[in-house]
Swiss-Prot record:
Any one GO molecular function term: ubiquitin-like ligase-substrate adaptor activity
Lineage: Viruses, Varidnaviria, Bamfordvirae, Preplasmiviricota, Tectiliviricetes
Domain notes: Contains a PML interaction motif that allows the subnuclear PML localization.
GO cellular component terms, A-Z: host cell cytoplasm; host cell nucleus
Family, per entry: Belongs to the adenoviridae E1B 55 kDa protein family.
Name listed for the protein in its UniProt record: E1B 55 kDa protein
InterPro entries, alphabetized: Adeno_E1B_55K_N, Adeno_E1B_55kDa, Pectin_lyase_fold/virulence
Biological processes, Gene Ontology terms: symbiont-mediated perturbation of host apoptosis; symbiont-mediated perturbation of host ubiquitin-like protein modification
Composition skew (Low complexity), residue ranges: 34-44
Subunit and partners: Interacts with host PML-4 and PML-5; this interaction promotes efficient subnuclear targeting of E1B-55K to PML nuclear bodies. Interacts with E4-ORF3 protein. Interacts with E4-ORF6 protein.
Positions where Phosphoserine occurs in the chain: 486-487
């Protein structure tokens, strides 16, 4: 420890006198500097309260002690002398300086800026602008011809301050810069076929309108090969505080490789033909919604921590998707074909339970929910892997056969009309539980939010276990038959 009242300022206990330090050799000078560094680090590890440290530093400054500045550990950190800084930052092997803080680039987008410049300067076979194609297709004959392809249209590189709607109407082929951040502050109406390449750019939805992108009915325009719909690809959408719908489409829409993060409402609402492929949905309320008479195609998409993944009221095709930590992966009200998907239920954390009033009864939304309908057929449900999920099956026409589905730790709720119309012959059924709903207990109703937007009272169902009544006898029906394997190539 240092003496309480040192007579020589700046020289700690154990050091030589100041006159002798000036005449010492280089090795002794370096040893003294290293000793000073160890003493400084030792003083910074002293466990002092903030009050004691403040009083001690004030008293030390008044008594002639060397001042010290407070460090992150709560103690005093001695200011380094220039000689000590050179010793600590000099490498012993290479001789170069080390431990020196270098200024970081404030933007941090050097790589993305280089990528943007590389994409903008790349040579492409682009020869004609969109307005030139429009001017050539004025008459009735040329408007039906496909004279140009997408590769021949010139690209308009959109800046963050540009108007999206005007650029789409005038250029049709749009590209975003990956080093820029775009913000949507008003509704964008799209009335012509277009091709928008995002290049991984981030688009923040910041508007009070009901829909951010409204894909309206398209007029008669000259055809371009490869641009027959409204196409958006490789765009990252964020909805910080946005409570509306991102895409409302009543025309043909293609979303390719986009990601949606943190939307409190519907991401894609389809009233026409919509194709969603290779997209990712993170922490969204409703990812995709196919309304009545819509044709929704969802392929190779990922749903994570969403409340409702796919809402289907019309026609839907769901292929090769993955869902995890999603309360309801698909709610089938219309006709659907669900094949080759991997559905993982929620973890130990219990999600918020919503209702659905479709089918005449208010039931808790299951991970896979099939609504009962007196005239609709069962959905095609094949080759799916379901783990730690719940299924709700309502009554429909025909027989429901989840062919070659792996149901591991799955609880299936069967409505009374669906009990005799479900066959679990061709599935992996070791850890499946089948329950039949007998009636609804109206003594303890609970009011919950519904997927329709309102709130309803939910009555507790009274169920009975019917697993062994529906499970086939595997000693009679062997698993070596043609149901679980075939010599031919399985096709989608």
């Amino acid at each position: 420890m240092d003496p309480p009242n040192s007579l020589q300022q700046g020289i700690r206990f154990g050091f030589h006198s100041s006159s002798f330090v000036e005449n010492m050799e280089g090795s002794q000078d370096e040893d003294n500097l290293r000793l000073l560094a160890s003493a400084a680090s030792g003083s910074s590890r002293d466990t002092e309260t903030p009050t004691d440290h403040a009083s001690g530093s004030a008293g030390g400054a008044a008594g002639g002690q060397s001042e010290s500045r407070p460090g992150p550990s709560g103690g005093g950190v001695a200011d380094l002398f220039p000689e000590l800084r050179r010793v600590l930052t000099r490498s012993t092997t290479s001789g170069q300086n080390r431990g020196i803080k270098r200024e970081r680039n404030p933007s941090g987008n050097n790589s993305r800026t280089e990528l943007a410049l590389s994409l903008m300067s790349r040579r492409r076979p682009e020869t004609v602008w969109w307005h030139e194609v429009q001017s050539e297709g004025r008459d009735e004959v040329s408007i039906l011809q496909e004279k140009y392809s997408l590769e021949q249209l010139k690209t308009c590189w959109l800046e963050p301050e540009d108007d999206w709607e005007v650029a789409i109407r005038n250029y049709a082929k749009i590209s975003l810069r990956p080093d820029k951040q775009y913000r949507i502050t008003k509704k964008i109406n799209i009335r012509n076929a277009c091709y928008i390449s995002g290049n991984g750019a981030e688009v923040i939805i910041d508007t009070q309108d009901k829909a951010a992108f409204r894909c309206c009915m398209m007029g008669m325009w000259p055809g371009v090969v490869g641009m027959e719909a409204i196409t958006l690809m490789n765009i990252r959408f964020r909805g910080d505080g946005y409570n509306g719908i991102v895409f409302m489409a009543n025309t043909k829409l293609i979303l390719h490789g986009c990601s949606f993060f943190g939307f409190n409402n519907t991401c894609v609402e389809a009233w026409g033909q919509v194709s969603v492929r290779g997209c990712s949905f993170y922490a969204c309320w409703i990812a995709t919604s196919g309304r009545v008479k819509s044709q929704l195609s969802v392929k190779k998409c990922m749903f994570e921590r969403c409340n409702l993944g796919i809402l289907n009221e019309g026609e839907a095709r769901v292929r090769h998707c993955a869902a995890t930590e999603t309360a309801c992966f698909i709610l089938i009200k219309g006709n659907a074909s669900v094949k080759h998907n991997m559905i993982c239920g929620h973890s130990d954390e219990r999600p918020y339970q919503m209702l659905t009033c479709a089918g005449g009864h208010c039931n808790i939304l299951a991970t896979v929910h099939i609504v009962s309908h007196a005239r609709k057929k069962w959905p095609v449900f094949e080759h799916n892997v379901i783990t730690k999920c719940t299924m709700h099956i309502g009554g429909r026409r025909g027989m429901f056969m989840p062919y070659q589905c792996n149901m591991n730790h799955v609880k299936v709720m069967l409505e009374p009309d669906a009990f005799s119309r479900v066959s679990v012959t061709g599935i992996f059924d070791m850890n499946i539980q089948l329950w039949k709903i007998l009636r609804y207990d109206d003594t303890k109703p609970r009011v919950r939010a519904c997927e329709c937007g309102g709130k309803h009272a939910r009555f507790q169902p009274v169920c009975v276990d019917v697993t062994e009544d529906l499970r086939p006898d595997h000693l009679v029906l062997a698993c070596t038959g043609a149901e679980f394997g075939s010599s031919g190539e399985e096709t989608d």
